[in-house]
């Protein structure tokens, strides 16, 4: 499904990657959100850092494609990628296995992390209180059929940036394969290894990502500009050197 002709200002904020596949770089932390549209549904990749951002993403994606969002894939359980999820009523939410348990157990830490990074305390508290957890845990690979020959592969490529890293891959007729990487790949800054990262496993996660996407895919980092396979390989090697693994 292609973007609609009259989509107001939304079209200017979303980058077209392939027919029916777009992404937007959100203000603040330069986090990526994506959308993939088929004839029978629309899948959104990540939901931003607040309910306000989630509402804006939902509205703009519907302006771009017409049908409402039906599926969400959360690439990892960090505040800037999940706190808008409650703005999408009635959708099917996917995450790497264990992500839902972590988000359920560590709500206070999620809220504190958001506030530490500059989210207003009341905004963070509201989003965490209403947070929608993934209904569908992905332990290996799972295909979501959006109709009209659009099939989205959800792949648990972690651990790496976190213990629960999910990649989203789609190949549509007339376009390149597109890989939404989450924060296992970052372009606008050094990859961030927080206290929940598994540094020694991270290079292997990128090996899995490259094996799935291949040399000709378009790779969409969790933060920053779109990159190619060679960039991902260089980042993989830099992480291996940084963390002392082969």
Go through the PLM ranges and name each one.
Residues 228-246:
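Binuclear metal-ion centers of metallo-dependent hydrolases, dominated by the metallo-beta-lactamase
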Residues 23, 43-46, 70-73, 153-154:
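Short catalytic-loop micro-motif centered on adjacent basic/acidic residues
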Residues 16, 41-43, 49-51, 101-156, 207, ...:
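Metallo-beta-lactamase
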Residues 11-59, 166-183:
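Conserved beta-strand hairpin/beta-sheet module of binuclear metal-dependent hydrolase folds
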Residues 52-95, 211-218:
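Active-site metal-binding motif and surrounding structural segment of the metallo-beta-lactamase
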Residues 20, 36, 46, 61, ...:
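Divalent metal-coordination and catalytic microenvironments
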Residues 49-50, 97-101, 185, 244:
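Short, acidic/turn-prone active-site loops that include or flank metal/cofactor-
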């Amino acid at each position: 499904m292609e973007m609609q002709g009259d989509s107001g200002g939304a079209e200017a904020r979303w980058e077209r990657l392939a027919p029916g596949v777009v992404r937007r770089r959100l203000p603040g932390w330069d986090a990526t959100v994506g959308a993939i549209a088929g004839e029978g549904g629309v899948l959104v990749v990540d939901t931003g850092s607040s309910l306000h951002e989630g509402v804006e993403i939902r509205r703009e994606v519907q302006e771009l494609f017409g049908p409402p969002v039906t599926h969400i894939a959360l690439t990892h359980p960090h505040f800037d990628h999940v706190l808008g999820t409650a703005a999408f009523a009635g959708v099917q939410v996917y995450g790497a296995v264990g992500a839902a348990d972590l988000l359920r157990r560590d709500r206070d830490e999620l809220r504190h992390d958001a506030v530490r990074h500059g989210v207003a305390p009341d905004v963070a508290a509201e989003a965490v209180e209403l947070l929608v957890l993934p209904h569908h845990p992905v332990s290996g690979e799972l295909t979501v059929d959006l109709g009209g020959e659009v099939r989205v592969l959800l792949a648990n490529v972690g651990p790496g940036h976190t213990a629960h890293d999910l990649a989203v891959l789609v190949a549509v007729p007339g376009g390149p394969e597109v890989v939404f990487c989450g924060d296992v790949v970052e372009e606008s800054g050094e990859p961030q290894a927080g206290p929940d990262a598994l540094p020694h496993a991270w290079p292997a996660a990128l090996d899995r990502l490259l094996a799935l996407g291949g040399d000709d895919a378009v790779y969409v980092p969790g933060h920053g500009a779109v990159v190619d396979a060679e960039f991902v390989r260089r980042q993989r090697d830099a992480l291996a050197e940084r963390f002392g693994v082969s």
